[in-house]
Amino acid sequence: MTTASCFAAHASDSPLVPHQVTRRVPGTNDVHIDIEFCGVCHTDIHYAHNDWGRTVYPIVPGHEIVGTVRALGSSVKDLHIGQRVAVGCFVDSCHHCSSCDNDMEQYCLSGFTPTYNGSSADEGCVTYGGYSKNIVVDRHFVLKVPENLDPAGAAPLLCAGITTYSPLKHWGVKAGMTVGVIGLGGLGHMGIKFARAMGARTVMITNSAHKAADAKRLGADDVLLFTDQAAVAKQAGQFDFLLNTIPSPHDVTSYMNLLKIDGTMCIVGSIGPTSELNSRPLIFGRRSIAGSLVGGIKETQEMLDFCGQHQIVSDIEIIKMQDINHAYERMQASDVKYRFVIDIGQSLS
């Protein structure tokens, strides 16, 4: 066992403070990673504050991890010491259910093991995430980071990136299609970048007129102000696919008339109950509402390679580990464009 400096929350109403956790000695299939950067996700805040009622304290958040290989288990032959690698939202799964057999570990029928606040099958203990100096992970769940990507900007790709890439890829977004990205935040800004890189006409859909300029800077071909009823009416039936990144409950069916016949809106932002469903725009257009989590390991590697080919990273603000509590406050006030990334290498010793 080795120790790792980290920051942890010890109660729902306490700030994150310096802490230490133990990491297992790398096994034959393990990779020991020195963490350079870790993105900050809204999920981190939810777990730190026990918003979902299942946090195990102390908790060390962080599932957008980029670092370099410190040590390798004897069976790991395709990585080398010093290589830049990444770890995303989960570090284990059952490996044998139909989902895992089809490279969709995120939908493991036994439940995947989250990178933090999960139960390690091998050790029977709680997993600790990337707000930490180092981590030990099974090779299967370690990803290769293209050499041309900025490592800090690449960190949010492990959650915000794959959360938006996976549904766009699954629903076949390509040139000749029109895609609407609803909401401009950590997820929405990645949705714009990916949809545009896939060749689709990309429209940012927002209630905030002041976000229009930034949406176009990120690559949006157009901006639809959803509070402009006349403009919305003109766009009815024009979209092949809607990527809904709004993080809070809302009337999802209010957007459905924007879709073409057989169009799909995929929800990736808001988890849990929402307003009552009006089925009329679905039935009178054979439209669909769907949801998507993150991607499996194979697809996440594909996404990273796609980002390398298209020079895609997240728009970020780098912070020190010691500033994490203030960063949480700013995130809750929507005061970041568009993801915070912790410089672990320069913050923890």
What are these model-predicted stretches?
Residues 2-4, 253, 297-349:
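C-terminal hydrophobic helical "lid"/dimerization subdomain
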Residues 24-38, 51-101, 106, 128, ...:
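Glycine-rich beta-strand-centered segment in the early N-terminal region that forms part
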Residues 84, 178, 263-264, 288:
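Short glycine-centered segments of the SAM/dcSAM-binding site in methyltransferase folds
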Residues 94-182:
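NAD(P)H dinucleotide-binding glycine-rich loop of Rossmann-like/cofactor-binding domains
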Residues 188-189:
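N-terminal Rossmann-fold NAD(P) dinucleotide-binding loop
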Residues 259-260:
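Helix-to-beta-strand junctions that scaffold the AdoMet/dcAdoMet cofactor pocket
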Residues 264-266, 277-317:
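Rossmann-fold dehydrogenase core element
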